[in-house]
């Protein structure tokens, strides 16, 4: 099948928002990925504006850890996005295939993703939808950030609107809490998403479980309970858990100021995080079970003493 100068090889991905195909340029035989908008959203101007922004964003970012457009471009007769073809797998699939990755492997992947995010931030852009499905790991082990449909470009808000009337562009479990409160995103918002991904790679779960998706108000986010990465993962150093805890803090001002600080703390023991948090912080349920058991023992002893005194 031919399409606007490309030979369609096969479908790579399909969703209710777009279809992605592997295609070959008829002139150069270069393999590329073609992303075509869903016909169901052809009357959605906000979606179409975000879609048109994707390749524009890709052409302005130069990083080995960000999806690239092809070097050549031709006049087009239809609306679609052309990018390099990455032969590999999503980070989601990678985590399924590698359920217990070595700490060093996780560090290397997180550092690559951070480099890609810094390329966005240097251009005053926020990715806003960082999640395992939007990260590809190629056959050489290189991590690449993909899908720029939710990217915010400073000064071009009208072309890529942020969340409107509670319509969060990112995926709930990885979306920073400030977005749910109607606040503007910052680089620390992308930091939150990266922290959640790092936590998930090491533990196989999410730091707040399903709580993020349920919370909406400032007070609800203030009550979020971080589940320590040390639970059931004794091989993870306490200072790694401390770094993760700070990266995914519900309050953006209590997160790291920069991505480089986070990646540094994943490699170097921070004295502030050298000891495990108190049991009540790591496992509140277990703490109260112990506390209840101790209290019950105290009550039994007091009753026994009282009984002996009376007799």
What do these predicted ranges mean?
Residues 72:
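Activation-segment/catalytic-loop signature of the eukaryotic protein kinase fold
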Residues 109-110:
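Activation segment signature within eukaryotic-like protein kinase domains
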Residues 171-273:
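C-terminal lobe helix-coil module of Hanks-type protein kinase domains
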Residues 115-125:
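Protein kinase catalytic-loop region centered on the HRD/HxD motif
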Residues 38-60:
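AlphaC helix of the eukaryotic protein kinase fold
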Residues 13, 53, 62-65, 168:
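Flexible N-lobe loop architecture of eukaryotic-like protein kinase catalytic domains
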Residues 76-90, 94:
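Conserved short submotifs of the Hanks-type protein kinase catalytic core
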């Amino acid at each position: 099948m031919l399409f606007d100068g490309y030979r369609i090889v096969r479908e790579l991905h399909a969703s209710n928002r777009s279809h992605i195909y592997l295609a070959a340029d008829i002139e150069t035989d270069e393999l590329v990925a073609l992303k075509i908008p869903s016909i169901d959203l052809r009357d959605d101007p906000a979606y179409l504006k975000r879609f048109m922004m994707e390749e524009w964003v890709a052409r302005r970012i130069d990083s080995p850890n960000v999806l690239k457009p092809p070097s050549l471009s031709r006049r087009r007769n239809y609306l679609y996005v052309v990018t390099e073809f990455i032969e590999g797998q999503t980070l989601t699939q990678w985590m399924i295939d590698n359920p217990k990755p070595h700490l060093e492997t996780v560090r290397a992947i997180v550092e690559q993703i951070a480099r890609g995010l810094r390329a966005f931030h240097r251009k005053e852009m926020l990715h806003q939808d960082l999640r395992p499905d939007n990260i590809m790991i190629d056959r050489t082990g290189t991590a690449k950030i993909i899908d720029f449909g939710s990217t915010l470009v400073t000064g071009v808000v009208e072309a890529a609107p942020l969340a409107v009337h509670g319509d969060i562009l990112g995926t709930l479990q990885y979306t920073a809490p400030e977005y749910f409160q109607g606040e503007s995103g910052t680089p620390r918002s992308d930091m939150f998403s990266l922290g959640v991904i790092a936590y998930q790679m090491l533990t196989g779960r999410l730091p707040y479980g399903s709580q993020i998706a349920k919370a909406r108000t400032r007070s609800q986010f203030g009550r979020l309970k971080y589940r320590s990465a040390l639970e059931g993962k004794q091989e993870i150093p306490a200072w790694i858990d401390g770094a993760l805890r700070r990266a995914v803090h519900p309050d953006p001002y209590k997160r790291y100021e920069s991505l480089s600080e986070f990646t540094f703390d994943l490699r170097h023991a921070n004295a502030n995080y050298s000891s495990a948090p108190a049991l009540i912080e790591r496992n509140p349920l277990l703490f109260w079970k112990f506390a209840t058991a101790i209290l019950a023992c105290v009550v039994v002893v007091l009753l026994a003493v009282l009984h002996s005194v009376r007799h």
